[in-house]
From Swiss-Prot:
This is Histidinol-phosphate aminotransferase 3. NCBIfam families: hisC, PRK03317.1. It comes from Burkholderia lata (strain ATCC 17760 / DSM 23089 / LMG 22485 / NCIMB 9086 / R18194 / 383). Belongs to the class-II pyridoxal-phosphate-dependent aminotransferase family. Histidinol-phosphate aminotransferase subfamily. The gene is hisC3. It comes from the Bacteria. It is an enzyme of class 2 (transferase). Its cofactor is pyridoxal 5'-phosphate. GO terms for molecular function: histidinol-phosphate transaminase activity; pyridoxal phosphate binding. GO terms for biological process: L-histidine biosynthetic process. Homodimer. Pathway: Amino-acid biosynthesis; L-histidine biosynthesis; L-histidine from 5-phospho-alpha-D-ribose 1-diphosphate: step 7/9. The modification N6-(pyridoxal phosphate)lysine is found at K233.
Length: 370
């Protein structure tokens, strides 16, 4: 006989009304030979770096009976040094904040600057978690569709800002799922118009093409700008779950008001610091990934497919009358990609050369059956 506590269904619980028809967000996690669906760096850390990270975590374990540094000063210093190196803008530790993935950073931003009676503005197709952040913080989300080539219609964006007066504007550059980057002048114009904070989500910034600037370059002139980044993508540290942002020190103080106590464990801090010390090694395959991306774009276009320009480590391509059939056909051949973006499109993460060869062979096989 099943015990009562195990027999209770979700529908039996006194769940909040707004959650009753919701589904938990998450990409498929399947055991397949070629996994190209969640935009990870396909190259693992070297054995030597694994050992250094393990040593750092072991050192932290010696004080595991104590709470970690709640303001993670060492990690913020390492992140500030990296941003300064990457962008050429001097960033100090007081202008950096971090959490368990940039998901948590953006959620904290919505907790601090959104909430009941306030709104946010995003541009679709956009990262689907923005919906989740707004729902869980009771922030009303306004959306504006991108143009046919997935750019922003700047005039419409400015009109929407004037109409809705959002507390938070969410910009994604490079955008997920399209891969397209925003012109820096468009970001500047939105900053000039926005009454609240402007978030530029740069999770994929390290993959941007040469000559595409980071929004971090705008920070000195715009105290309400927040640029979010992550170690999960280019830094091949997805398992470490560390995201961060650069912003005015006053915004850091605002985020401290909503963070949970000791939200970054001592082990997370130690591992991330070790990874950042080895930043050259962690980022050593970025140029190879960019080259593979560009060749993938050319190859897909050679098949007559529509492919969005990409400054990320993934490519969105279509247009398919039945994208699920293509996705399923690839999966049957051991290749997992993502049904993401507008319905005619699919998204493929850039993997190793061997993984991309498998993807190309599988796609040709599936398309031959159409």
């Amino acid at each position: 006989m099943q015990q009562p506590w195990k027999a209770v269904a979700l529908s039996d619980l006194p769940l909040r009304e707004d959650l009753k028809l919701q589904h938990a967000y998450g990409a498929p996690q399947l055991d397949v030979p070629v996994c190209l669906n969640v935009n990870e760096n396909p190259y693992p850390p070297s054995p030597a770096l694994v050992e250094r990270i393990a040593t750092a975590v072991a050192d932290a374990a010696r004080a595991a009976n104590r709470y970690p540094d709640r303001d993670f000063a060492a990690l913020r210093s390492h992140l500030a040094a990296y941003l300064t190196h990457d962008t050429g803008v001097t960033v100090d530790a007081s202008s950096v904040w971090a959490a368990n993935g940039s998901n948590e950073v953006i959620q904290q931003i919505l907790q601090a600057f959104g909430g009941p009676g306030r709104s946010a503005l995003a541009f679709t197709p956009a990262y689907p978690m923005y919906d989740e952040y707004c729902r869980t913080t009771f922030t009303r989300l306004h959306t504006l569709p991108r143009t046919e080539d997935f750019a922003l219609d700047l005039n419409q964006a400015l009109d929407s800002i004037r109409a809705h007066q959002p507390g938070v504007v969410l910009l994604t550059s490079p955008n997920n799922p399209t891969g397209t980057a925003l012109p820096i002048d468009d970001i500047r114009a939105i900053l000039d118009a926005a009454p609240g904070v402007v978030v530029v989500d740069e999770a994929y910034a390290e993959f941007r093409r040469h000559g595409v600037p980071s929004a971090v370059t705008l920070l000195p002139a715009y105290p309400r700008l927040i640029v979010t980044r992550t170690l999960s993508k280019a830094f091949k540290f997805a398992g470490g779950r560390v995201g961060y942002c650069a912003c005015a020190p006053a915004i850091v103080e605002a985020l401290k008001l909503v963070r949970l106590p000791y939200h970054l464990s001592a082990f997370t801090q130690a591992a991330a610091c070790a990874a950042l010390v080895a930043r050259d090694e962690m980022l050593s395959q970025v140029e190879a990934i960019k080259a593979e991306r560009d060749s993938t774009v050319d190859w897909l276009r050679g098949l007559g497919l529509t492919v969005a320009d990409s400054d990320a480590n993934f490519v969105m391509f279509g247009e398919f009358a039945d994208r699920h059939r293509i996705w399923s056909g690839l999966l049957r051949r051991g290749v997992l990609i993502r049904e993401s973006g507008p319905p005619p499109y699919l998204r493929v993460s850039i993997g190793t050369g061997a993984e991309m060869a498998a993807f190309r062979a599988a796609l040709l096989d599936v398309m031959a059956l159409e």
